[in-house]
Amino acid sequence: PVIAMVSYSNFGSDNQGSPLRVHEAIKILHEQYPEIIIDGEMQMNFALNNKLRDKSYPFNKLKGREVNTIVFPNLSSANSAYKMMLEMGVAESIGPIQMGLNKPIHFTDIASSTRDIVNLTTVAVLDAIVQERRNKQ
């Protein structure tokens, strides 16, 4: 994956509140997991437009790549963008995916289609396989 962490600021232009938390998370990820292709914080237009991002912020670690994974700063902004994309018909839903819990858990939306449920079931099965392998180690 090529991951962008989005915010309302770009690469430290606002150094307080949620942009600062995103910026600090990126710093930790770059230090501890340098193999992960991730950068931010950045506004959505810079995340989605690699030419604009590369021209404006040539130091970015996503240079020349198209983002295929977006991490939002909070549930409210993530859910709003997710619902907007679904209503506009520009994305297929896979999720929501809960992470960081001791056991896999997944929720379906009241408006989920059969395809949405099949996709989420696939994620749940993969979660179970990964967890089983971890438990055997």
How would you describe each model-predicted region?
Residues 1, 33-35, 65-68, 93-94, ...:
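Short coil/turn connectors at secondary-structure junctions
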Residues 1-4, 33-42, 131-137:
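Flexible, glycine/charged-enriched surface loops at secondary-structure junctions
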Residues 4-6, 106:
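Short, well-ordered beta-strand segments
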Residues 8-69:
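Active-site rim loops that border cofactor/substrate pockets in soluble metabolic enzymes
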Residues 11, 75-78:
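Short glycine-rich anion-binding loops that position phosphate/pyrophosphate groups of nucleotides
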Residues 14-21, 73, 109-116:
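Catalytic cores of large soluble enzymes that bind and process phosphate-bearing ligands
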Residues 60-62, 77, 82-137:
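Internal helix-turn-beta structural module
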